[in-house]
């Protein structure tokens, strides 16, 4: 009996170590929309000034991985670990294989340029660590990823890919 407990503890420890070593943890689901990656650290010195700041350099890419279904982002919510959130309030359709960059700062949303601005001159993603969540209009988690700067960003450029 003791031998089984020791073996179970060793297996559990090995599993936890493997999970801790994974660069960006993903909560996989059957949803077509996935978080493709995050530019969590905007290039340059962080500044939240609306006209001269660099909040537009911070973005989250959402991609439609479906082979055939078009998805409307209206009602989807993006949030971080602290609960700061952005809700897509307008129609924004993603064709199969298409993506959108949800950028910080203010700008003009464009289906043609695949960009939606949060309309806020603050940063959403923490530079040291955070978790990005994408939830459906009904409140179910479509995708989520946790990252740490030291464990997930091997080249130190402030961008972490989640899905190819």
Each predicted region: which residue ranges?
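Solvent-exposed coil/turn segments that connect beta secondary-structure elements
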Residues: 65-67, 81-83, 105-107, 137
